[in-house]
Curated annotation (Swiss-Prot):
EC number: 1.2.1.-
Span list, region Disordered: 1-22
GO MF term list: ATP binding; oxidoreductase activity; phosphopantetheine binding
Source superkingdom: Eukaryota
Family (UniProt): Belongs to the adenylate-forming reductase family.
Protein name (record): Adenylate-forming reductase Nps10
GO biological process: biosynthetic process
Region (Adenylation (A) domain): 38-451
Region spans: Reductase (R) domain: 712-951
EC top class named in words: oxidoreductase
SMART domains, alphabetized: PKS_PP
Residues in Carrier domain copies: 586-668
Entry keyword set: ATP-binding, NADP, Nucleotide-binding, Oxidoreductase, Phosphopantetheine, Phosphoprotein
Length: 1088
């Protein structure tokens, strides 16, 4: 049916919004398009907030309309450039607007800004859900005539698979071009950087031209692209004006809403019309995955008034009394996309939680009254919005189907019916009226039997049942799952295969018998509609299927007949998991790893490397649930572990086989407590709290010594050896206790210390200096593993503690570093037990590895950071914990501490640089590949002897945090030009070199032998070399070095260290490179 034109101007909406705002001006909604409204706000509501999120330090970051519109123009310029157009010229659209697909997992702010930027550039954006199969992506590309696709890295594999299919499809149009999706920092730049930017030339779009293409859920064979014109988008934007509450300035939490979803764009339109503020996760790449816990906590931290989410999250929150109490304090919780269980809703409203039941569709728009003013105890029922003209049409079973009629307030984007001579859209949704409240309606079901899950996803059972019904053992089948997390199927066997399904053995046999057909069905189904073997229910001979005269199953009657069995199978699945994977015979590390590997591979039907993020390999929420349930079943069956205390999100918190195995093994062996399932930032804070209480009092009883006595841990390492040599040479230092763990070998500590000094080009005889007392002990023990006499001697004499001993292992979890954290606390207690007037200063060598999750918008300052920034690997997390414990100790006690964030250390006076690190491995691989990588950018590597001198300088400073990197960074190009000269190897662009390394990895196969790795050790770090590199066009370029390490402010460090402040301190250069290469040749790492 042809479309219906929308008349201009739109009728003036009721004056319900923008009553009391000092920053928001209601825009003219009658004739402007949404992009024009954006520009209008940049001039008339410039300081009104559009987005907000929680900063790293816990503060709220607000993005105003003026700032966002500038970012939109940047996105538009970028888009025009990507399509080969001048950024300041209006594209020629006589042949129609190009359709630009967006296949990306981005934070909501970046995504919505990008969508609007594509519109400003003169093109039609088409957000494509990354949950689609590659076949569905091909279908959408063809149907929407997509000419260009913006792709984000995690979706590249999906797009490549789609392109392979496109190449083999002779009916497909030409292959779309592609570009890389921007990150937040590409679009939102500092005010200084933004000065002088001009707005893009923008041609007012026609009212009836396409503003955006949205696709349906893909519940049928393939999702359908649905175009919204600019006129339609403006109609939808006015929905809040037909509501009952003023939303201007209200903060709506959108953390659970992917912006490629219909509601993502609708919320942006509502914000433009009403001044609603959209709260989301802090922009970062990769984007934060929504979980039950982080959506709830982030929504509250951002002071949200309303939380918009999916029913499955609401159900989970309802089980937590503390959550429910908090939800009751909000304006309300809005849910949509699927049904909420009646018992759940009843529990919440009885606790005074206001529920807003949002109903609508991509085709017809939002149809329920949004954000009603009154608390509705009958939360399942809602009124139809005044914006919509509807009719309730009885069907053959006397149920009422909602039909949406075209009007100038609400014109459906799709028409499939005519009602009383008016074009209309028949929704297929069946409604029941409220028995006593006229005008209130409840959804009963669907005429097309579409199943709405609690996740908001939908399953259309017809095509899937048709596939299964072709199996010779199946007479008929019915899919079920309304209001549930996942789908199941009820199968009626043919007469010769009937059996009593209470016979577990026969049930298992029949499931195996029809499983190939189920797998065929699953291959056709979208991810959320796939059926697991345990979700196959078989009919009982005592309750046969009933059929209509047309020999079709009486769906509703049969589903109702099997209601108890359906409830029971969901209960069983919640309590169990895949029963066909045996539990390990023991829960040690090796056997647990094998078990987890088998579970992940069985559920995902593909092999995933132990260290890989299985969500990046396509694991969806349904598969995550099966992995979780299978693990919990095995733990319950074979251990005494208290699984009730494990977080629902533990799969997301440990998203690789290796990390998940480590977690599960610790739970099974009773090494984990109730906090083990919390998100990693919470784990870090919990560990800080555990070791930041009950500090001993400091009781001074002796005068301060005239000279310093230092307790130095880790003196046999590269940095420790250099520190030791400098302390020995210092006239202000009377004694050094060089503290190290006992060696597994029988080599005496004196010999180990001499060897360590010699290896770094230092005088080995220093180990026997009269200033040095070599101590073997264990800081993880309360008495440091030494005699009472020696401990007392150290306690009464030391003036400083330099804690430099910490294992470097990026594969260990935070829990694995708890002994080291405990050791730091023991050293804090030792300091506080000192009889001196001031406790010995504790200097702790932290790491720049803490800054894994920082938004590189400026150099990192010498101030405390939040746990979220340091969430990465256990090593970086443990360093943050250590730094924060010291800060807490300084707050609660007289302790003075200095946390030194040590950067990348390079070789010292003799060039000694550990061969296992990334740079030596890179250069060794370059020799093998006969090419060195070159690129723009700086490196702030600092020679280990210079870093040691700075740390000794810091002993006399009162600053609590120091950033320790080279104060005079060198360029990557200068360093690698020196390598090229010394090694006689040509330079090639970094990306070209990376391609050579990748090719060598393919040639080496999945399991390269030891000889290959010895000659080409960069194979082990290929992924890191790819992900760490920061291109000069990347937004992070200004505030990161070439390999992605942040740039650092060094105000405190330069003030405290004469070594660093010395203008004569040389940059790294060719002389350093020669020393490194000579050392690597000397130890046999490089060929002579």
């Amino acid at each position: 049916m042809s479309s219906v034109s929308i008349q201009i101007p739109l009728p003036t909406p009721p004056p319900t919004q923008a009553h009391n705002s000092q920053t928001f001006c209601a825009p003219p909604l009658g004739s402007l398009t949404l992009p024009e409204v954006f520009d209008w706000h940049s001039k008339n509501s410039p300081n009104h907030p559009l987005y907000s999120y929680i900063n790293i330090d816990g503060s709220i970051r607000t993005i105003t309309w003026a700032e966002s519109v500038r970012a939109v123009h940047r996105a538009a310029r970028r888009m025009r450039t990507e399509l080969g157009l001048s950024s300041d010229s209006v594209p020629d659209l006589t042949a129609g607007k190009p359709v630009v697909g967006i296949l990306a997992v981005l934070d909501s702010i970046t995504y919505s800004t990008l969508v609007t930027g594509v519109q400003y550039a003169g093109f039609t954006p088409f957000p494509i859900s990354p949950r689609n199969s590659h076949a569905a992506v091909v279908h959408l590309i063809n149907k929407a005539f997509v000419s260009h696709i913006i792709v984000e890295e995690s979706c590249r594999g999906l797009l490549e698979d789609a392109f392979q299919s496109l190449k083999s499809d002779l009916t497909s149009p030409s292959m779309p071009t592609t570009s890389v999706a921007p990150v937040f920092e590409d679009l939102y730049v500092s005010s200084d950087s933004a000065q002088g930017e001009a707005s893009v030339a923008f041609e007012t779009p026609a009212w009836d031209s396409n503003a955006i293409i949205i696709h349906s859920s893909g519940s049928t064979a393939f999702p359908k692209p649905i175009a919204w014109t600019h006129g339609r988008a403006m109609q939808l934007s006015t929905v809040p004006w037909y509501g009952e509450r003023d939303l201007t300035g209200k903060r709506m939490a959108c953390h659970a809403m992917p912006m490629y979803h219909t509601m993502g764009y609708l919320l942006l339109a509502w914000a433009a019309s009403s001044g609603l503020v959209l709260n989301g996760f802090r922009p970062q790449s990769p984007a934060t995955k929504s979980t039950i816990e982080n959506v709830f906590s982030a929504s509250l931290e951002a002071h949200s008034d309303i939380i918009f989410t999916v029913p499955s999250f609401v159900e989970a929150w309802s089980k937590n009394p503390a959550y429910v109490k908090t939800l009751a304090e909000l304006d309300g919780v809005m849910f949509g996309g699927g049904p909420l269980g009646k018992q759940v809703g009843d529990v919440l409203v009885s606790a005074n939680v206001t529920l807003f039941n949002l109903y609508g569709s991509t085709e017809a728009g939002v149809l329920s009254s949004t954000v009603p003013a009154d608390f509705n105890i009958d939360w399942e029922y809602f009124r139809i919005s005044d914006i919509a003209k509807v009719a309730f049409v009885p069907n053959e079973e006397n149920k009422l189907e909602l039909v949406v009629l075209s009007s100038n307030l609400n014109t459906p984007s799709v028409f499939n019916a005519v009602y009383e001579d008016v074009p209309a859209y028949a929704t297929s949704d069946l409604f029941e009226p409220h028995p006593t409240k006229p005008g209130y309606w409840k959804i009963f079901g669907r005429t097309d039997d579409q199943i709405m899950h609690s996740t908001g996803e939908k399953t259309n059972p017809g095509p899937l049942e048709h596939i299964l019904n072709q199996d010779p053992h199946v007479r008929a089948s019915l899919m079920f799952g309304r209001g549930q997390f996942q789908a199941g199927v009820l199968v009626d066997p043919t007469s010769e295969y009937r059996f009593d399904p209470s016979d577990e053995e026969k049930l298992a046999e029949f499931r195996n018998l029809i499983w190939p057909s189920v797998e065929e069905m699953n291959a056709y189904a979208p991810q959320h509609s796939r059926v697991f073997k345990e979700m196959i229910l078989v009919s009982s001979p005592s309750k046969p299927f009933t059929f209509t005269a047309k020999n079709s199953v009486r769906r509703q009657a049969v589903i109702q007949e099997y209601d108890d069995e359906i409830k029971a199978i969901y209960f069983a699945v919640d309590e169990t998991g895949r029963a066909d994977i045996p539990s390990p015979t023991a829960w040690d590390s090796a056997k647990t790893l094998g078990f987890i590997r088998a579970v992940v591979q069985k559920v995902m039907k593909k092999e995933v490397q132990d260290g890989d993020d299985f969500f990046q390999h396509g694991c969806d929420s349904l598969q995550a649930t099966w992995i979780r349930n299978t693990i919990l079943r095995s733990l319950k069956d074979s251990t005494d572990a208290n699984t009730q205390d494990i977080s629902n999100s533990f799969i997301y918190q440990h998203p690789s086989v290796a990390s998940l195995a480590s977690f599960v093994s610790s739970v099974a062996q009773g090494q984990n407590n109730i906090n083990s399932g919390l998100d990693r930032a919470q784990e870090m804070n919990i560990m800080v709290a555990r070791y930041s209480k009950d500090f001993p009092p400091h009781v001074p009883s002796a005068p301060q010594p005239s000279k310093d006595t230092i307790l130095l841990t880790g003196s046999t390492g590269a940095l420790g050896s250099n520190i030791l040599a400098l302390l020995i040479a210092s006239p202000s230092v009377a004694r050094i206790y060089a503290f190290n763990r006992k060696s597994r070998s029988s080599i005496p500590l004196l010999d180990r210390q001499k060897s360590a000094l010699l290896e770094r080009g230092l005088d080995p005889s220093l180990a026997a200096s009269k200033k040095v007392v070599l101590v073997e002990g264990d800081v993880t023990k309360q008495d440091l593993g030494i005699s009472t006499e020696l401990l007392s001697e150290i306690r009464v004499s030391i003036t400083h503690i330099i804690h430099n001993a910490w294992p470097v292992n990026f594969n260990l979890s935070l829990e694995s570093f708890e002994p080291q954290v405990k050791g730091l606390r023991h050293l804090v207690d030792l300091s506080l037990s000192s009889p001196h007037p001031s406790p010995p200063r504790v200097l702790f060598t932290a790491s720049i590895g803490m800054f894994n999750d920082i938004t590189r918008a400026e150099p990192v300052k010498e101030v405390p950071i939040g746990a979220n920034v340091a969430v990465s690997n256990g090593y970086g997390e443990s360093k943050w914990v250590g730094e924060t414990i010291l800060a807490e100790a300084a707050k609660q006690t007289p302790l003075r501490s200095t946390s030194i964030r040590v950067g990348q250390l390079s070789g010292g006076i003799n060039g000694a640089w550990t061969t296992a690190e990334w740079l030596p491995s890179l250069v060794r691989s370059a020799i093998h590949l006969k090419a060195l990588p070159d690129c723009e950018g700086d490196v702030s590597w600092i020679p280990v002897n210079v870093a040691a001198a700075a740390i000794v300088d810091f002993c006399q400073s009162d600053s609590s945090i120091m950033n320790l990197v080279h104060p005079r960074p060198a360029t990557w190009s200068s360093i690698f030009s020196a390598f090229a000269s010394v090694l006689n190897i040509p330079l090639v662009p970094y990306t070209e070199w990376l391609a050579l390394l990748r090719k060598s990895a393919e040639d080496a196969g999945d399991a390269p032998d030891a000889d290959s790795l010895q000659q080409n050790p960069g194979l082990r770090l290929l992924d890191w070399y790819h992900s760490a590199f920061v291109h000069e066009n990347d937004s992070a370029y200004q505030y990161a070095d070439t390999m992605g390490f942040p740039k650092f402010d060094m105000t405190n460090s330069l003030r405290a260290s004469g070594t660093l402040a010395d203008e004569g301190l040389p940059q790294l250069g060719e002389s350093d490179v020669k020393l490194w290469v000579d050392y690597w040749k000397k130890v046999g790492f490089f060929p002579a």
